[in-house]
Amino acid sequence: MHADPIYTLIIVLLILMIFIDTLMRRRRVAGIISLTSSSILILTIYNLLHHEFSDIIIAKGILLNSGLGFRFLTSNIIFFSLLTLLFILSRLRDPESSGFRLLTPSFVFIALSIISKTLLQNITLLSTGIFLSILYIIFEKSEDKGAIRRALLILGGSVVLILIGAGISLHYCPDLTISGFYLEGGFASFIATLFITIACLTLMGVPFWRNWLPTTRDTSGPLSTLIETMLFIVGASILISIGRAMERTSYIIIVASMIGTLPGAILVLREEKKNIITTMRGTLGAIAGVGVGLGYSATIRGAEIIVITGAVALLLMHIF
């Protein structure tokens, strides 16, 4: 890793966020580690272990895009050890938490994605895992059957906007090669737009969990921390790999994909008028996630500004 002052500042901000979160929200914090700061911090540590920003960092771990080398195995083991430690800490704080059981589908598909050798297959597996986890939790835990209707509205509205985004990206990304697997024409741009939108929806999904699950209405609860941290890491990972593949077209595609989050945000604001702060935090988390993905992919200039802006905004949200 290069000794870049910008990344040093990011790390300092993230560490500061943890202490601020612990001190200012002690009465409501069920665990020591904050969901957003911990997830970004884990990603930062993961990159420090690789000592390079010019390669596909997270893709070597969750989204396997290269050969199995010693450094890959070592850093990947440490990465998942840190993630497991986060789960254990939350579990100790609340022995009754069913976070492990609820997150089982995600773990299964992450494991499958590591075994898989094609980036497209990896993203497909991870995306499928995300949706299965969402459906599993809705049917398993939600007492409000209207949550299913809201989920379908969010996903349905997003699919329509995904198609619009694919049409826009078609003009900027006629062809795309992913890990040697060549995709032609509009199909390539559609696939890329689809999965970036899924990643953005994942990062923007924080407010929805709190509406669907009675156990996560306490936004600082262990189960909420587990779910949101996992979503943040998976969403940022997808953005990192796709950001690398899309290169110059990333700006256009991501802007189009972020449009897909509007139905969900509007729905939350309409049904939960007092939930504006929660929605803002979810939006800021998405901004930070996009910045992390693009910043670590080393393909988009100015991504560091997005990361810092998101980190500062999240820091302010923790204080107020």
Name these PLM-found stretches.
Residues 1-8, 18-101, 175-182:
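Transmembrane helix-loop-helix hairpins at membrane boundaries of multipass inner-membrane proteins
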Residues 2-5, 87-100, 221-227, 249, ...:
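Short, amphipathic, aromatic/basic-enriched membrane-interface segments that mark the entry/exit
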Residues 2-12, 69-82, 119-129, 186-202, ...:
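Structural signature of hydrophobic alpha-helical transmembrane segments
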Residues 7-12, 94-106, 229-232, 254-256, ...:
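Short hydrophobic alpha-helical membrane-embedded segments
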Residues 13-18, 84-87, 103-111, 260-264, ...:
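Hydrophobic, membrane-inserted alpha-helices
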Residues 23-30, 101-188, 202, 267-320:
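Alpha-helical multi-pass transmembrane bundles of energy-transducing inner-membrane proteins
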Residues 45-53, 168-174, 232-248, 290-300:
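Membrane-interface helix-cap regions at the ends of transmembrane helices
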Residues 60-61, 67, 147, 190-252, ...:
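Short helix-boundary/re-entrant hairpin motifs in multi-pass inner-membrane proteins
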